[in-house]
């Protein structure tokens, strides 16, 4: 099992006047979700979605997932993931503080399936997932516990994932939609060659 360890200095924002005190250093570990799919569902699945709710709560437009929705997502989707592409970050007490979830792009497979929900429609999807994947990877999400944000946890996840991408033959990565004002996630792309090739806009018009 590949494990990456990083010492993080956490600035506890307890200030006396303008003085900031560093109170402690914690050790965190980044490793693949080295579990069976059953263990992933039972042990980490709920933790991952709870972490998402906590990490994304301040973002505009985010609506927290209910327990019923979480159970449905775990049941429906976790079995499709390659757990090598699901790095988790835990603290010294094995508490989840960060996670990244990526998977092979299914865009071409869905085009070949033409929306068919028969066995013939699922064959291209299964082929792309388990036999011959695309050169593109879809970065579905990255979530970090709020008190660890801005401390390099996302860099730890990326430093684990990039060698895995190379090993598995991926050449390009596509991120999910991101808020332009979410500077924390936008700034992580400064270290990579990247292109912003899609932009969405929503407008409102008062009706009198």
Functional labels for PLM-detected ranges:
Residues 136-137, 165-179, 189:
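Conserved GNAT acetyl-CoA-binding A-motif
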Residues 175, 199-201:
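Long, positively charged, glycine-interspersed low-complexity recognition regions
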Residues 1-2, 188-199:
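Conserved acetyl-CoA-binding loop of GNAT-fold acetyltransferases
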Residues 80, 91-95, 131, 163-171, ...:
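Secondary-structure transition/capping motifs at alpha-helix termini
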Residues 9, 144-149, 175-185:
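Conserved beta-strand-loop-alpha-helix junction that forms the acyl-donor binding cleft
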Residues 1-35, 201-207:
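Acyl-donor-binding surface of acyltransferase catalytic domains
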Residues 136, 140-144, 149-163, 191:
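Conserved acetyl-CoA-binding loop-helix of GNAT-fold acetyltransferases
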Residues 38-143:
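A conserved beta-strand-loop-helix scaffold within acyl/acetyltransferase catalytic domains
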């Amino acid at each position: 099992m590949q494990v990456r360890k990083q010492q993080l200095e956490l600035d506890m924002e307890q200030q006396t006047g303008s003085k900031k005190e560093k109170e402690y250093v914690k050790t965190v570990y980044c490793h693949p979700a080295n579990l069976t799919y059953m263990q992933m569902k039972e042990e980490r699945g709920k933790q991952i979605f709870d972490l998402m709710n906590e990490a994304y709560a301040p973002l505009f437009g985010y609506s927290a997932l209910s327990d019923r929705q979480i159970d449905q997502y775990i049941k429906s989707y976790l079995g499709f993931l390659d757990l090598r592409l699901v790095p988790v970050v835990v603290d010294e007490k094995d508490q989840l503080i960060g996670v990244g979830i990526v998977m092979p792009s299914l865009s071409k497979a869905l085009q070949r399936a033409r929306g068919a929900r028969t066995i013939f429609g699922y064959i291209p999807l299964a082929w792309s997932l388990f036999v011959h994947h695309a050169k593109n990877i879809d970065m579905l999400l990255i979530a970090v516990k709020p008190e660890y944000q801005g401390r390099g946890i996302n860099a730890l996840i990326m430093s684990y994932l990039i060698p895995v991408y190379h090993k598995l033959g991926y050449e390009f990565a596509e991120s999910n939609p991101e808020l332009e004002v979410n500077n924390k996630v936008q700034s992580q792309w400064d270290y990579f060659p990247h292109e912003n090739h899609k932009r969405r806009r929503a407008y409102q018009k008062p009706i009198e």
